[in-house]
Amino acid sequence: MEGPKKVNQIIIKTSQPKDIEQLLAHGAKADKVYIGQNGYAFETISPEGDHFLLHAEEDVSHLELTDLPSLTKDDAFKGLSDFTFEKIVLNVLDQENSRDFYLKIFEGEFPIELDFVQMQGPDLALEPHIAWDLEILEVGVPKDFDLAKLKSQLEAKGVSIYLDTKETVLVLSDPSLIEIWFMK
């Protein structure tokens, strides 16, 4: 890697605040611990430098930095029982271009919230298979979803599309060369 990665932060939300406490009690690596209205949250940085925030709040802006608490382990705890990927923050070469792409193509209906931070670095423009970084955003669609129709709609917006012959996978790339796969 040379310069910043495409992934700035991935924000994960759980509906089970007690799961966060148990992850911390069982020794989950927490680089920063926060407290909010619903309980604890924490940020961890992967060995590859990816930032993950796990929380159970309605609004993460209310989280306050705190010290790692002393928590009691529940031996029956099996892991995070419920979660959603709430938001992905991407480092991009052109913030406005990236934001405009997603608004134009998906008209505000992309299934996960995306945010963009303008950065500089050669790896931000690399093909996905060259660097260890975010390669694909996968979007599941129902079996009866008409990918051929979606292909036509996206091509009408000037987007280059790949659709497999069985019409089960449609692929396009965003300005950062992150592939977006619609899969049945």
Listing of model-derived features with the role each one plays in the protein:
Residues 1, 83, 88-123:
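Core segments of cupin and vicinal oxygen chelate
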Residues 1-2, 75-79, 125-129:
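Short, flexible, solvent-exposed loop/turn segments with mixed acidic/basic and small polar residues
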Residues 1-6, 13-14:
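DNA polymerase sliding clamps and clamp-related checkpoint/processivity subunits
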Residues 7-10, 59-99, 134-137:
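N-terminal beta-strand motif that seeds the catalytic metal site of vicinal oxygen chelate
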Residues 11, 25, 65-78, 113-117, ...:
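N-terminal secretory/membrane-targeting helices
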Residues 11-51, 93-97, 121, 137-184:
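Vicinal oxygen chelate
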Residues 49-59:
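A contiguous, low-structure linker/loop signature
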Residues 110-139, 147-150:
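Acidic/His-leaning functional-site neighborhoods
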